[in-house]
Amino acid sequence: MLSRSRCVSRAFSRSLSAFQKGNCPLGRRSLPGVSLCQGPGYPNSRKVVINNSVFSVRFFRTTAVCKDDLVTVKTPAFAESVTEGDVRWEKAVGDTVAEDEVVCEIETDKTSVQVPSPANGVIEALLVPDGGKVEGGTPLFTLRKTGAAPAKAKPAEAPAAAAPKAEPTAAAVPPPAAPIPTQMPPVPSPSQPPSGKPVSAVKPTVAPPLAEPGAGKGLRSEHREKMNRMRQRIAQRLKEAQNTCAMLTTFNEIDMSNIQEMRARHKEAFLKKHNLKLGFMSAFVKASAFALQEQPVVNAVIDDTTKEVVYRDYIDISVAVATPRGLVVPVIRNVEAMNFADIERTITELGEKARKNELAIEDMDGGTFTISNGGVFGSLFGTPIINPPQSAILGMHGIFDRPVAIGGKVEVRPMMYVALTYDHRLIDGREAVTFLRKIKAAVEDPRVLLLDL
């Protein structure tokens, strides 16, 4: 064993000497991962001493693309009121994406945030599973950049027309008819004697089995779907409102005759000047701001931590908008300084963003009062639930012709029921009823707003 080790050592020494002198055919070429002691040192290298000869063995990795071409995309920063969200992937590993193309969507408590691709490239890896929870700054996916945008697929060329079938050159000649027999053929003698039982010409058939009761009807089934984060948050907030607030609702009805007449008379001029349609929501938003200035307690809120009442000198009205994902409430800020055109423009912009699922969290943060319009769905009557941490909410309903007493006579007028749900811990019945009557007066006669009555 000892002699064998010495032989191996001598053979290795001779090879090493030949390598150092250049006699080895590989001595003049650089070997990957191996360098002589005269070469520079590397942080990932280690030195090996064999027969007083020092070698440096370097371990490394190589890649075909520069590191700068591989980008890690992280979760965008959330607002202070949002801590995490659920990821829903729109692309998979290996998909080619263009710059600003949506790769995934992060669903938070309030809205959905779309994460676009920062450049043209190919998805290398998805770092979070579908449905996984992420926080702000969490790595989402890696993208390998490419030079140009992905080419659109060319439309498939129409297949070549099939060659027309060859038409028959001549009609087929029918075969000659067989001769008609003039005599009946002889009756064959039976090989077995006939039995005494008659033979039926029709084979007996078995009646089909009777169908089970209810088999022809549709099958009864059920399926389950996980609640999305927005629906969970809505359920949580509404239950918090019921458990925290002492909610009470007061009602009134509004004659919509004058506001309908004003809209019909000025909608064309309004559209021509502002390029906006004149609706009823702007009238209720403006009337609510007018009433909130008269009754500031409705615009206030209780701070349960410090047991204080917070009065706001600004009016930010949240307008409820129904989307396929759930109810969202974007905020119209500083309504007290707006006119009808400003309100209509803001409502149009927020509604368009809500339908396209482009609302940012900043669009829904805050709000001192909420208006919910169930009338667009044909609602006749209802009691809305407060949107915490606010103290009141106005519920609008449908406009229906009803007989009402006007000056001692019965007339048919377009009427709307309105409901005000408020936190009775802070707002007394007198303030709530006065507030709702202010809205009624401003909508029934818009001149009240002009004259500040």
Curated annotation (Swiss-Prot):
Effect of residue 422 to C: In PPGL7; uncertain significance; not changed dihydrolipoyllysine-residue succinyltransferase activity
Keywords: Acetylation, Acyltransferase, Disease variant, Lipoyl, Mitochondrion, Nucleus, Phosphoprotein, Transferase, Transit peptide, Tricarboxylic acid cycle
InterPro entries hit by this protein: 2-oxoA_DH_lipoyl-BS, 2-oxoacid_dehydrogenase, 2-oxoacid_DH_actylTfrase, Biotin_lipoyl, CAT-like_dom_sf, Single_hybrid_motif, SucB
Biased composition (Low complexity): 152-172
Annotated GO CC locations: cytosol; membrane; mitochondrial matrix; mitochondrion; nucleoplasm; nucleus; oxoadipate dehydrogenase complex; oxoglutarate dehydrogenase complex
EC numbers on record: 2.3.1.61
Disordered as annotated region, ranges: 152-225
Cofactor field: (R)-lipoate
Location of the Lipoyl-binding domain: 70-144
N6-acetyllysine carried by residues: 154, 267, 272-273, 277, 307
Record: transit peptide: 1-67
Location of this chain's protein in the cell: Mitochondrion matrix; Nucleus
GO biological process: 2-oxoglutarate metabolic process; generation of precursor metabolites and energy; L-lysine catabolic process to acetyl-CoA via saccharopine; succinyl-CoA metabolic process; tricarboxylic acid cycle
Entry's cofactor comment: Binds 1 lipoyl cofactor covalently.
Segment forming the signal sequence: none
Biased composition (Pro residues): 173-196
Listed SUPFAM superfamilies: CoA-dependent acyltransferases (SSF52777), Single hybrid motif (SSF51230)
Catalytic activity: N(6)-[(R)-dihydrolipoyl]-L-lysyl-[protein] + succinyl-CoA = N(6)-[(R)-S(8)-succinyldihydrolipoyl]-L-lysyl-[protein] + CoA
Modified residues (N6-lipoyllysine): 110
Location of the active site: 424, 428
Phosphoserine: modified positions: 81
Function summary: Dihydrolipoamide succinyltransferase (E2) component of the 2-oxoglutarate dehydrogenase complex. The 2-oxoglutarate dehydrogenase complex catalyzes the overall conversion of 2-oxoglutarate to succinyl-CoA and CO(2). The 2-oxoglutarate dehydrogenase complex is mainly active in the mitochondrion. A fraction of the 2-oxoglutarate dehydrogenase complex also localizes in the nucleus and is required for lysine succinylation of histones: associates with KAT2A on chromatin and provides succinyl-CoA to histone succinyltransferase KAT2A.
Subunit structure of this chain's protein: The 2-oxoglutarate dehydrogenase complex is composed of OGDH (2-oxoglutarate dehydrogenase; E1), DLST (dihydrolipoamide succinyltransferase; E2), DLD (dihydrolipoamide dehydrogenase; E3) and the assembly factor KGD4. It contains multiple copies of the three enzymatic components (E1, E2 and E3). In the nucleus, the 2-oxoglutarate dehydrogenase complex associates with KAT2A. Interacts with ABHD11; this interaction maintains the functional lipoylation of the 2-oxoglutarate dehydrogenase complex.
Disease link: Pheochromocytoma/paraganglioma syndrome 7: A form of pheochromocytoma/paraganglioma syndrome, a tumor predisposition syndrome characterized by the development of neuroendocrine tumors, usually in adulthood. Pheochromocytomas are catecholamine-producing tumors that arise from chromaffin cells in the adrenal medulla. Paragangliomas develop from sympathetic paraganglia in the thorax, abdomen, and pelvis, as well as from parasympathetic paraganglia in the head and neck. PPGL7 tumors are generally benign, tend to be abdominal, and often secrete normetanephrine.
Family named by the database record: Belongs to the 2-oxoacid dehydrogenase family.
Name listed for the protein in its UniProt record: Dihydrolipoyllysine-residue succinyltransferase component of 2-oxoglutarate dehydrogenase complex, mitochondrial
Organism: Homo sapiens
Classification lineage: Eukaryota, Metazoa, Chordata, Craniata, Vertebrata
